[in-house]
Amino acid sequence: MSLFRGSGVALVTPFTEEKDVNYEELGRLIEFQIENGTDAIIICGTTGEPVTMSEEERLSVISYTVEKTAGRVPVIAGSGGNCTENVVSFSKKAQLFGADGLLVVTPYYNKATQNGLYEHYKVVAMAVDIPIVLYNVPSRTGVNFLPDTAARMGNDI
């Protein structure tokens, strides 16, 4: 697994008035970022509103982004959630759809212990063959993935 370098931009997901993904605008956003030197595109992260989309829509956005970037920059796809099994399932699909890496938010609401967070991320990391970015945003999730836990994970995986 290679590490990502430089600056990655977390894109919004543009929608039409009818609440469908606006692929024309998404394409413009992707091209703008690449033309202006971003080193990676992050899709379906918090600002991409994945919780408002179906799994089919999320996978379609990932697939479109992979196709549009055409290998010019890596695509990092948001695949996080509360249920480890669901995160693993979606992460595998995102990898099949061509994502170069995964953005996996710390499970929210349930307030897992540090060991629970470690196990969650370990199971996800072991299930895919692409790098994962641990997305620790305690102000949104209500739980903080502590540095000691991250160091343990870095040593073990």
Language-model segments: residues:
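Active-site beta->alpha loop and helix N-cap motifs at the rims of alpha/beta catalytic domains
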Residues: S2-V9, P14-N144, A150
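Active-site/ligand-binding-proximal alpha/beta "capping" segment
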Residues: T149-I157
